[in-house]
Amino acid sequence: MRSIFYFALAFAALTCSNASAALPNPDETRLLSDTFTKRSLRVAGQEAARGEEIVRVTAQSTNKIFKRPAEKDMSKLIAAAKKALLEKKMAKLSKVIKKPAK
């Protein structure tokens, strides 16, 4: 089991060194990893590391898409939820009543 681990470790080390040796400029490996980091941060929506401007733009765009629950009238939401729960219970009861007894 230990030999498999050492083999995998050696393979990973050789792969990384060969990939960096294949590029003519050794600094390009660092640039490629920086680009990957930026892309992964964009996907996660965590561009806060680049500055306050990006955070504000991101926050404004999400506020346009989704309204915050605090801005909505919560009493209407609670009433709608209670109504949906009551309808669900009534549907269950109607299924039980309609089943023929064997």
Curated annotation (Swiss-Prot):
Q: What is known of its domains?
A: The RxLR-dEER motif acts to carry the protein into the host cell cytoplasm through binding to cell surface phosphatidylinositol-3-phosphate.
Q: How does the annotation summarize its subunit structure?
A: Interacts with host KRBP1.
Q: Any S-S bridges, and between which cysteines?
A: none
Q: In which broad location class does this protein mainly occur, judging by the first location in its UniProt entry?
A: secreted
Q: Where in the cell is it found?
A: Secreted; Host cytoplasm; Host nucleus, Host nucleolus; Host nucleus
Family that this chain belongs to:
Belongs to the RxLR effector family.
Q: Which organism is it from?
A: Phytophthora infestans (strain T30-4)
Sorted keywords for this record are: Host cytoplasm, Host nucleus, Secreted, Signal, Virulence
Task: Show which residues constitute the signal peptide.
Answer: 1-21
Q: What protein name is recorded for this chain?
A: RxLR effector protein PexRD41
Q: What does this protein do?
A: Effector that enhances P.infestans colonization of host plant leaves. During the early stages of P.infestans infection, interacts with and stabilizes host potato K-homology (KH) RNA-binding protein KRBP1, leading to its accumulation.
Presence of keyword Calcium: no
Induction, per UniProt: Expression is induced during host plant infection.
Query: Where does the motif RxLR-dEER lie?
Result: 39-53
